[in-house]
Amino acid sequence: MDQTRDISLEGWNIVRADEADWVPWTGSAGEARAKILGTADGSMVTLVEAQPGYAGSPHEHAHSEFNYVVEGTLRSQGQQMSAGDGYAAAAGSTHSDFETEAGATYIVIFKI
């Protein structure tokens, strides 16, 4: 018996990672690519693969931002982070330091 047939997906955006396209992910240095894994109400869940030497561009967060490191290491706001680490940045906070020397894969959730 298929118990999922009566479950509504209204308001849901479920994306299969193997069906999502990689798109360029911009920064101030190095290369990265991303897969958009879901969007809702202006927010998105994004899987990012950053190559060694990638650095994000400084910016202010208009909305909160959440990050989870899946693999590798990165530095955010002067703090070293590795697989399993994460951060939450409040709306209005300034992101002035984001870099990976060795490369990293991470999930970032934010609103545009």
Language-model regions, residue ranges each:
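A short, N-terminal "cap"/entry segment at the start of jelly-roll beta-barrel domains
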Residues: 1-42
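Conserved short histidine dyad/triad with adjacent acidic residue
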Residues: 27-33, 38-60, 80, 90-94, ...
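Conserved GNAT-family N-acetyltransferase fold
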Residues: 48, 67, 87
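Glycine- and acidic-residue-biased ligand/ion/polar-headgroup-sensing regions
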Residues: 52, 62-76
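A short hydrophobic beta-strand segment most commonly corresponding to one strand
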Residues: 88, 101-112
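Short, Lys/Arg- and Gly-enriched loop/turn segments at beta-strand edges
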Residues: 96-100
